[in-house]
């Protein structure tokens, strides 16, 4: 049993693979190559890392004669005409595929840094063949392709599906852009929070550093005071130390002022940058709200357009269904009309055949009637004449006694004949009976003219047999009756013949009566002949009337049938014409409605195209603005990172200074302790106790400051770590968003490039057509110029010929005048040069006229 076939053909944007011819005897697995299953031309295994091992299934359903494709929980998805069958890692329901569909297994994998496709996906065009070898049906008009009879219908059928797909893709892109904008807004909010936290941490760290500087300065002052108190110096040395201390104080104040000024400047710059960031954030929020409103409006318009498009498609489908129904009704009516026409034609043919058969029967009956009439007349002539002759011969041949003896028998026979003739009424059967009786009579009278009777009997028998054979079919009942009568008569004749010869005397007496009876019989026979002729004429007239009536009835039936047929044909034609007119009107109305709907859908599509272009431009502007905002945010992030690094460096420097100050402070404390131990003996108790108390207070403050410094440093490190982690996360998210935006930008650029290429192709085709038209126009112009030049030349030649003709006519007139003058002179006086002058005139005329003809001829 043959099986269905699926052919996978590689497309240019696909991972390269050989063309696959896969027979679908059973469900075929589509997936990545493994050790047990390698790629081959008769399987659906591909050497591609994007595919899963069990990516999809393809099979052919013999019940419905359809092909199906199912995604079996693939990670990267399966696409039919850029539409995904299911979500990630979910099994899709079986989806019908048609011949010519574009099937994609997986998606392209790209690098974020170089934006280069590292692993391509499988993109193929599938061709499907049924088990009988025929190609499966292609995708219908409402999805991708729509080949219709006219280019207008092609545009009306093809462009809506393409633009609906583009609108769907644009809506998807806009949704993705909105999602990215929301993510960017969230990231900006987190950045703002981080900036606020970093500002607070920096403020607290600066405040802690300032407090620490103050404490250190106080410690130094107190140390100096301790040194001054511990030393017993003179006033000059004390003055010098005071001056040095004042200078140190002044230097510390200047450094503190400069540091404060720098901190204030940095704070002002940070505030300014923060205000700029807030301003840009508000602008981006306004733009986001505007874009969101635009997106909502475009989505509403897209929904309205989709609804209108679906309504138009449904109306077109309804109209097409109505057209099909009307065409079906028209075909049914035509079929019914043809069937009725065929039935009527068959009835007409049957009636004509019956008419021919009836005519043949009528002719046959007419011929039989004529033949029977001729036979009857012939039989009457043949039978009656011999009977008369017999009677005469018998009368003449019989002598006195014999005649007298047989007269009563003859009279009895004549009476019987008259009786039989009166019974039969001139029927041919009675003639046959009469012949039989005559035979019996002649057998009794055998001594009378045997030879003549035998010859007559033989003739009569032959004629009777012929008549019986001719009239056996029509006169069978009369034969039966006549046969019964003849048998009865024969019996009666036998009884009469068996009577004794005693009746001879009676016969003699009745001779005269016999002669009278004979004459009466002759008269009766003549009367019967007349009646028979009249009956024959009446039969002929009745038959003729019957034939005429039958013919008239047939003619009337034929005419009525023809009239019925003509009326039915006219009614059918009228109904067909009316129905055709109605169908034409319906078709015209439907065509007009379809044209109006197509024009309205075209206008809507043109407006949708304009809106799509505007949306493209708005999306491009939004993408460019988003890119600029993203770049500015990246620059600001870089600046913030640089500032954070500067702050970190400053904090590290401050920490180093604090450590150095702590080390110096510890050294000084040790020195002070040594000096205090040395001078403990010198100092008195009250001052030493005061200094110890102050020292303890300062130590406690120093410890508390150290603890605060440790806490602030740990808090600063924690915040720096959080800031670093958040900045890394945000940078990763921003890079991923940037890659997605770049991918969408590339897709939009590819779409714009394809649209531009299509536009360029159309423009090139139009240019070629325009160039061809221009060339044709130039050729026509050249031909026109050539014809104009030829016409001008012909006009000039015509004018020249006209001038020459005019000049020749003038010269001829002059010559005629000269000839007249010469003739007049010749009449007055004979001139011998007259023929010479005529010849010269003719020669000059020929010389002047022939070149003009030669010029005018080309």
Swiss-Prot record:
Membrane topology designation: Single-pass type IV membrane protein
FHA domain boundaries: 28-85
Keyword Endoplasmic reticulum found: yes
Coiled coil: 169-204, 232-381, 516-829
UniProt key word Transmembrane: yes
Record topological domains on the Extracellular side: 854-858
Record remark on domains: Alternative spliced transmembrane domains determine subcellular targeting. Isoforms 1, 2, 3 and 4 are targeted to endoplasmic reticulum membrane as well as mitochondrion membrane. Isoform 5 is not targeted to mitochondrion membrane but to endoplasmic reticulum membrane.
Residue ranges annotated as Cytoplasmic topological domain: 1-832
Keyword terms: Cell membrane, Coiled coil, Cytoplasm, Cytoskeleton, Endoplasmic reticulum, Membrane, Mitochondrion, Phosphoprotein, Transmembrane, Transmembrane helix
Chain positions covered by the region annotation Necessary for targeting to centrosomes: 1-165
Record's subcellular location: Cell membrane, Sarcolemma; Cytoplasm, Cytoskeleton, Microtubule organizing center, Centrosome; Endoplasmic reticulum membrane; Mitochondrion membrane
Organism expressing this protein natively: Rattus norvegicus (Rat)
SMART domains, alphabetized: FHA
Listed name of the protein: Sarcolemmal membrane-associated protein
Source domain of life: Eukaryota
CDD domains per record: CC1_SLMAP (cd21911), FHA_SLMAP (cd22679)
